[in-house]
Amino acid sequence: MKKRLLGNTGIEVSEIAFGGVEIGMPYGIGVSSEKDMLSESKAIELLHTAFDSGINFFDTARMYGESEKIMGKAFKARRDKVVLATKCRHLLNSDGNLPNDSMLKTIVKDSLYESLKTLQTDYVDIFMLHQANQRILENEAIVCVLSELKERGLFRAMGVSTYTTDETKMVLDSGHWNMIQLPFNLMDQRQGDLFEDAHHKGVGLVVRSVLLKGLLSDRGKNLHPALKDVENHIAKYQSLLEETNLKLPALATKFALSFSEVSSVLVGIDKRKYLDEALKTVDGIYLDKEKLEKANQLAYPEPEFINLPYWDRMNWLK
């Protein structure tokens, strides 16, 4: 599988990144409990198959249930062959405020140490802040402790996971960060306006939510009534699917990979068939300028409604 540089980090990542949330906890449309998930042994087997197929980039987090533990077991003997990314646990209190600076530093350090232990490694390649909102991004104590931990060799690249274009712009303007994981897909293309700036500043981009938690796949049918307009809009991609001779998941993935500024596309994988589908998209053939323009015109007319965290809170994705 072709690899791309992650900004100016010097880290080479596969075009497809294995999203590890589904192997660690119930997640996604149609996955309501542990009985819908792979066993630990099957999950490890799937990770090994992904690695043997050319994927070297694996994404996990403290909050993803058993995901870190499973990846630690899967790659203990191949640690130097894979790029591991994990995320700090949530920093905000239940009231939406940040703890004091001293407590923040302790939380960040403890989260990283716990991840290293669970992943059975003495470093990770990428350590990210999860759901980095304005309060978090403006806090100098967080940047300070992360810089200290990076200097100690506990991770190679300092990153953030953002949701909004305002958050992504703050990250790019700050000059502190090596990479950003952000949402970008056929339905909601707003973050694409910042790709050129990220490339100019040497910040690597990892795109997530390309399949919108399964909506842009065979799971995106018979949705909650609140998502009826979204379901109807998905049908509008049929002409582009026929023109490209692709299935919707492949089109969605190729769309993101067609932007040279994107280092890797994060795909949630919990079944061999979804791995195989992802692998078929990385054939070196991307959407040309004309097809990208058509895809742009087919973006959802109210992109602010494409809000997975909100949909989750409303239980629209069960």
Model region roles, listed by residue range:
Residues 6, 18, 50, 58, ...:
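Conserved, mostly hydrophobic/aromatic
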Residues 34-50, 103-120, 162-170:
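Short, acidic/polar
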Residues 13-17, 56-57, 63, 81-85, ...:
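Structural preference for beta-strand elements that scaffold enzyme active sites
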Residues 72-83, 116-120, 150, 172-175, ...:
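Acidic (Asp/Glu)-rich catalytic clusters
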Residues 29-37, 97-103, 221-224:
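Short glycine-enriched, charge-decorated loop/helix-capping segments at active-site entrances
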